[in-house]
Amino acid sequence: MAKMALIQRELKRDNLVAKYAKKHAEFKAIAGDVKRSDEERAAARLGLQKLPRNANPTRQRNRCAITGRPRGTFQHFGLARAKIREMAFAGEIPGIVKASW
């Protein structure tokens, strides 16, 4: 299980991304618009730089909802591969059965 501090840090990042999502999208749209003047685009890039570092969505990490494991996490389930295996064998995930051919 991951340390609680790491899980809390990730939750804090999620909150920051949600808080600044609208501003981030506006700045990105202006900075990428070639029809805008160079001054406007430079101002948008500067605005992006002034946002908190953890407000950038690329800094988010997918973690297992149960264990907090950062690697081997399936997006569809939100669980780590080991937990998916345990839960599937126990019959706790509907529609998943052990392969047999």
Swiss-Prot record:
Biological process, per Gene Ontology: translation
GO CC field: cytoplasm; small ribosomal subunit
HAMAP family: Ribosomal_uS14_1 (MF_00537)
Gene that specifies this protein: rpsN
Superkingdom, taxonomy of origin: Bacteria
Family: Belongs to the universal ribosomal protein uS14 family.
GO MF, one example: rRNA binding
Organism expressing this protein natively: Albidiferax ferrireducens (strain ATCC BAA-621 / DSM 15236 / T118) (Rhodoferax ferrireducens)
Segments traversing the membrane: none
Protein name: Small ribosomal subunit protein uS14
Pfam families xrefs: Ribosomal_S14
Keywords: Ribonucleoprotein, Ribosomal protein, RNA-binding, rRNA-binding
Role according to the record: Binds 16S rRNA, required for the assembly of 30S particles and may also be responsible for determining the conformation of the 16S rRNA at the A site.
Subunit: Part of the 30S ribosomal subunit. Contacts proteins S3 and S10.
